[in-house]
């Protein structure tokens, strides 16, 4: 009985250590700030620093995710995507998914 309690305690302790980092890493709103998306696309996803930059607020989640993947891989290398290419190596697949989900919830 003691071994089971000990194993349970160790497992729960591990969850309390790992879980906050996982949740934080997948927080799309926080990532939008820390990965500097807001610098070019604006805090609201609509107020861009240049008129030619896309307004991304409310964009379809699947579309946004695919665009992020294409920019990262180099499959999309037209227009302003070259500016993002230098940043995308810092964004994991999981973070891209969280960002796409967050952007889709922004008011267009």
Language-model features, listed with the residues they occupy:
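Bacterial N-terminal signal peptides that target proteins for export
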Residues: 2-11
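Axial heme c-ligation environment in periplasmic c-type cytochrome domains
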Residues: 49-57, 72-106
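The canonical Cys-X-X-Cys-His
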Residues: 36-43, 99, 103
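N-terminal (or domain-start) structured segment
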Residues: 34-35, 80
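Short pre-active-site segment immediately N-terminal to redox-active cysteine/selenocysteine motifs
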Residues: 35-36, 44, 60, 95
């Amino acid at each position: 009985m003691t071994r089971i309690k000990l194993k349970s305690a160790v497992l729960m302790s591990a969850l309390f250590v790992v879980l906050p980092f996982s949740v934080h890493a997948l927080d799309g709103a926080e990532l939008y700030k820390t990965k500097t998306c807001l610098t070019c696309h604006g805090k609201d996803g609509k107020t861009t620093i240049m008129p030619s930059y896309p307004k991304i607020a409310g964009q379809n989640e699947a579309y946004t995710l695919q665009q992020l993947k294409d920019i990262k891989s180099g499959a999309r290398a037209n227009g302003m995507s070259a500016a993002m290419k230098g940043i995308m190596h810092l964004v994991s697949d999981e973070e891209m998914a969280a960002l796409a989900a967050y952007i889709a919830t922004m008011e267009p």
